[in-house]
């Protein structure tokens, strides 16, 4: 793919997330800068089972920050990529995602509020915690990482102790 085509696709994506509505309303695509995903989308109807997934949002933000580093040319479009990626990252409210707990929740639903599950064990939430702890605007407290790390599961095999991270999202 030519660089110019990649820049266009990236800008379309970043502009969409930056300009789309944030909030608990049915047409929102995010809340506190965490993206809303859907298990079922039906044309001309409200999405079914919409929820903000904290780790999926972390993947999106990590990708945005990555392309912001890669696309470093001094052009208006590539400057906009860097600006939008930084703005999206700064908008994410990691403290809100804790819902007053020690660790980060899995997400939030417009109809019912925060999901009851929290990130536990060594899993993909490592990226979520790195982004949250490093946030220049709404950082997670250092204690949240210690709380998450305290849920790691350690195993022994052939006399060696290791950090377990099995299939199924760290189960």
Model-derived regions: residue spans:
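Ser/Thr/Asn(+Pro)-rich, low-complexity disordered segments
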Residues: 1-171
